[in-house]
From Swiss-Prot:
Function: Component of the NF-E2 complex essential for regulating erythroid and megakaryocytic maturation and differentiation. Binds to the hypersensitive site 2 (HS2) of the beta-globin control region (LCR). This subunit (NFE2) recognizes the TCAT/C sequence of the AP-1-like core palindrome present in a number of erythroid and megakaryocytic gene promoters. Requires MAFK or other small MAF proteins for binding to the NF-E2 motif. May play a role in all aspects of hemoglobin production from globin and heme synthesis to procurement of iron.
Recorded name of the encoding gene: Nfe2
Chain ranges of the bZIP domain: 266-329
Matches recorded under PROSITE patterns: BZIP, BZIP_BASIC
Motif (PXY motif 2): 79-83
Protein name (database record): Transcription factor NF-E2 45 kDa subunit
Superkingdom per UniProt: Eukaryota
Positions bearing the Glycyl lysine isopeptide (Lys-Gly) (interchain with G-Cter in SUMO) cross-link: K368
Leucine-zipper as annotated region, ranges: 291-298
Stretch list, region Transactivation domain: 1-206
Organism, as annotated: Rattus norvegicus (Rat)
UniProt modification remark: Phosphorylated on serine residues. In undifferentiated erythrocytes, phosphorylated by MAPK8 which then leads to ubiquitination and protein degradation. Sumoylated. Sumoylation is required for translocation to nuclear bodies PODs, anchoring to the gene loci, and transactivation of the beta-globin gene.
Length: 373
């Protein structure tokens, strides 16, 4: 906090004695001399006497540099510089500047030898700055005929864009080559030629067809094989008649045409395998019908079970109601029963039992009444 400035209408000197004022000035001068010797930068407060202004030292002399080439030869090593930048001047001491309570130190002077000895960045690392990190994003199939894709484009336009982008990249490399002022590497690495990685071709995923049933294909092959064999053997009637005709009609058909032994053997083989095929189809049909009937019977039994469960629940509820009514009637009867003294019977000590003839008796608990015919 800065000290309060003195007011013009008030005199501060008469407030302190003359002896104490002189001692304070001497003490203050000693403190200032100690801080100057130690090189400390302590914010000073205005003293009672004004200080003399310090003379202006004048501008600093500009440094001079020796002429040197910026681009030295590849096989020439630069000698150390004959001089360095002046580290400090007598007129401007290297003390940290103070702004309030913050001290800012002065950086060390830079020298030309330090700049030359500093390692240059790796050219491969500089090239990686402009390249994208990670694997390139795979492009979509240009031959896709899906009209729902938002990134849909023709294959020809993609090829034109690819060639245009490659041409622009090559022109950019030609216009802005990578050069370095100091070649501290061999001549092969002084001017490297970098080739861009080839663009990955999009993977075309073929749509897998659904599962193909083997049995229908076998049946079709068998039918076509029988037809081919019949045509090769010059059978005069189609294979459908051979398989589907009854026995009598089939025998009459064979009697109408004069056939050789090989033709008869082929016809009988075709009929046998066709009948086996029809029998297998009928067997599968009967199995499917049986499965359907069993499913229907199972559904019927499930619905019947649910109906019986509902009926059992209703019977249990009815039985519970009857038990409650019987208990109420039991207590009501015991309330009306009296002994010879006029006292009521306790239902915990006596029970009501009915005989075979319908008579009701009041007996103590634990005793059994003999059944009377």
């Amino acid at each position: 906090m800065p000290p309060c400035p003195p007011q013009p209408n008030r005199n501060r000197l008469p407030q302190l004695p003359t002896g104490e004022l002189g001692e304070m000035e001497l003490t203050w001068q000693e403190i200032m001399s100690i801080t100057e010797l130690q090189g400390l930068n302590v914010p000073s407060e205005p003293s009672f006497e004004p200080q003399a202004p310090t003379p202006y030292p004048g501008p600093l002399p500009p440094p001079t540099y020796c002429p040197c080439s910026i681009h030295p030869d590849a096989g020439f090593t630069l000698p150390p510089p004959p001089y360095e930048l002046p580290a400090s001047t007598p007129h401007a001491p290297d003390l940290p500047y103070s702004y309030g309570n913050i001290a800012i130190p002065v950086s060390k002077p830079l020298t030309l030898s330090g700049l030359l000895n500093e390692p240059l960045p790796d050219p491969l690392a500089l090239l990686d700055i402009g390249l994208p990190v990670g694997q390139p994003k795979p492009q979509e199939d240009p031959e896709s005929d899906s009209g729902l894709s938002l990134n849909y484009s023709d294959a020809e336009s993609l090829e034109l864009e690819g060639t245009e982008a490659g041409r622009r990249r090559s022109e950019y490399v030609d216009m802005y080559p990578v050069e370095y002022p100091y070649s501290l590497m061999p001549n092969s690495l002084a001017h490297p030629n970098y080739t861009l990685p080839p663009t990955e071709t999009p993977l075309v995923l073929e749509s897998s067809s659904g599962p193909v049933r083997a049995k229908p294909a076998v049946r079709g092959e068998a039918g076509s094989r029988d037809e081919r064999r019949a045509l090769a053997m010059k059978i005069p009637f189609p294979t459908d008649k051979i398989v589907n005709l009854p026995v009598d009609d089939f025998n009459e058909l064979l009697a109408q045409y004069p056939l050789t032994e090989s033709q008869l053997a082929l016809v009988r083989d075709i009929r046998r395998r066709g009948k086996n095929k029809v029998a297998a189809q009928n067997c599968r049909k009967r199995k499917l019908e049986t499965i359907v009937q069993l499913e229907r019977e199972l559904e019927r039994l499930g619905s019947e079970r649910e109906r019986l469960l509902r009926a059992r629940g209703e019977a249990d509820r009815t039985l519970e109601v009857m038990r409650q009514q019987l208990t109420e009637l039991y207590h009501d009867i015991f309330q009306h029963l009296r002994d010879e003294s006029g006292n009521s019977y306790s239902p915990e000590e006596y029970v009501l039992q009915q005989a075979a003839d319908g008579a009701i008796f009041l007996v103590p608990r634990g005793t059994k009444m003999e059944a009377t015919d």
